[in-house]
Design a protein with these regions (language model features):
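Surface-exposed acidic/polar loop and edge beta-strand patches at domain peripheries
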Residues: 1-157
Length: 157
């Protein structure tokens, strides 16, 4: 596995890229948002990725990123639990809707990276702890995403 500095965010934070490789496949994963930045099959890139972290920050899309805490829209940016507690979330779509985790969702976080290799399989696990109250959500969430490449098989879990 190759690891290199992909670039810096607008606040100066460093973003790293991790390259998983097999005979015909090469995959670049960023620790920023868990973004699948490049996916080469026999030398042809099959994803729409950018060449710098700032391009991802300036994009209105979520290209290749981990989405969360919630993927999709929450109308009026609020929800309630069975006990009647109402939670107001960040509204980041037309000032009325909570979209894909809010103004600073999982796609915009620097994740802790743990590369690994095992019996011809290269992999990368990313970890992020979303604290209670982040983007208005209750409770702490410990998130993990694992990417694996073995021969022609690539998986994300």
């Amino acid at each position: 596995m190759k690891t290199y500095t992909f670039g810096t965010l607008m606040d100066g934070s460093e973003v790293n890229a991790y390259t998983l490789e097999s005979d015909h496949i090469s995959v670049n994963i960023l620790n920023y948002g868990g973004i699948l930045q490049k996916f080469l099959v026999n030398g042809t890139d099959i994803v729409c990725g950018y060449d710098s972290p700032v391009d991802y920050q300036n994009s209105a899309g979520y290209q290749g990123a981990i989405i969360g805490r919630y993927a999709n829209r929450i109308r009026q940016g609020s929800f309630s639990l069975d006990d009647g507690t109402v939670y107001q979330l960040a509204k980041n779509e037309n000032s009325t809707t909570h979209l894909h985790g809010g103004t600073s969702g999982f796609d915009q976080k620097l994740w802790k990276a743990a590369p690994f290799s095992d019996n011809g399989c290269e992999g990368l696990s990313l970890f992020y702890i979303s604290p209670d109250g982040e983007e208005g959500y209750p409770g702490t969430v410990c998130a993990q995403v694992t990417y694996k490449l073995s021969g022609k098989q690539f998986s994300i879990r």
